Each structure stands twice: as structure tokens, then as C-alpha cells.
Amino acid sequence: MAVYLLAVAILFCIQGWPSGTVQGEVMPFMEVYDRSACQTREMLVPILKEYPNEVSHLFKPSCVPVLRCGGCCSDESLTCTATGKRSVGREVMRVDPHKGTSKIEVMQFKEHTACECRPRSPGDVNDGRNPKEGEPRARFPFV
């Protein structure tokens, strides 16, 4: 058995993992283009971002997978925007640290069903010269 595992490990080192992407391999342009397009994709969303009033509880896991719009548009004046949404349930464990109790429950999250590139609203475009309201004037990596 040990010889078999060693042979498999050596084969992976030589040929790469079975996913087809060898370490250091160049991804073809069309695959890069297709994968970067504005579309729904699975993203991990923190529960407290969707339910900010639930800070007195802990959740396991602390984030849930949902489909959300993401990707690049062909023009900087456009942004990838959800054009369809639905509500989906995710089972999570709610922990009440004060009572020492926990229970599994279903929480609802918005999931995107369709996306398209749409013009940015005037407040979304920032040329970088003037900070948006609430942003610091400068960002220093050492602060």
C-alpha cells in the first residue's frame, strides 16, 4: 500500500493534479475571459453582515455559501449588478453564549439568480482624487 501511495504522489508531481491544472500552467485566454465575466458565483457571506442585529449570538459556521453576482464588465463605467434575486434557506447553529445553549435553525439569505453589467450610479465612480464620505484622505500600509 505504501508503494502505491508513493507512486501516486510521484505521478502527481510529474503530471499535476487530476483537475487538469498543472502548477505553473498558463490558463488559456478564453477560459480566463469566461471565468472573469459578470455572472453568479458561489461566495461565502458572513452571517453578521446579513444579520447585523444578531451580534449577541455566535453562528456556526460564521459564513454561508450563496450565489452572488461578481466579475468584470467590459467598461469601467459599468458594474456587475444582480437582476434577479430569491430567498434561500441555510441551516446554521445559533449559539447563545450567555445562556450556554445552541440550536440548529434555518436562516434566510438573498441569493442572486441573474446578473448583467449596468451603468454605475454617480456615487459609485471615484476617480481616486477625492475620498468618498467617511473614507480616510490617505491610506498608508504602515499605519
Swiss-Prot record:
Keywords, ordered alphabetically: Disulfide bond, Growth factor, Pyrrolidone carboxylic acid, Secreted, Signal, Toxin
Stated family: Belongs to the PDGF/VEGF growth factor family. Snake venom VEGF subfamily.
Organism taxonomic ancestry: Eukaryota, Metazoa, Chordata, Craniata, Vertebrata
TM region positions: none
CDD domains associated with the record: PDGF
PROSITE patterns, alphabetized: PDGF_1, PDGF_2
GO BP annotation list: induction of positive chemotaxis; positive regulation of angiogenesis; positive regulation of endothelial cell proliferation; positive regulation of mast cell chemotaxis; response to hypoxia; sprouting angiogenesis; vascular endothelial growth factor receptor signaling pathway; vascular endothelial growth factor signaling pathway
Quaternary structure and interacting proteins, as annotated: Homodimer; disulfide-linked. Interacts with VEGF receptor-1 (FLT1) with a high affinity, whereas it binds to VEGF receptor-2 (KDR) with a low affinity. Does not bind to VEGFR-3/FLT4 and neuropilin-1 (NRP1).
Superkingdom per UniProt: Eukaryota
Disulfide feature: 38-80, 69-115, 73-117
InterPro entries: Cystine-knot_cytokine (IPR029034), PD_growth_factor_CS (IPR023581), PDGF/VEGF_dom (IPR000072), PDGF/VEGF_growth_factor (IPR050507)
Region (Disordered): 117-143
Signal sequence region: 1-24
Protein's recorded name: Snake venom vascular endothelial growth factor toxin
Tissues expressing this chain: Expressed by the venom gland.
Pfam family, one: PDGF
GO cellular component: extracellular space; membrane
Annotated GO MF terms: chemoattractant activity; growth factor activity; toxin activity; vascular endothelial growth factor receptor binding
Cited function: Snake venom VEGFs may contribute to venom dispersion and prey subjugation by inducing vascular permeability and hypotension. This protein activates the vascular endothelial growth factor receptor-1 (VEGFR-1/FLT1), and consequently promotes the proliferation and tissue factor production of endothelial cells, the neovascularization in the chicken chorioallantoic membrane, and increases vascular permeability. Also stimulates tissue-factor production and human monocyte chemotaxis.
Main localization category: secreted
Cellular localisation: Secreted
Post-translational modification Pyrrolidone carboxylic acid (Glu), affected residues: 25
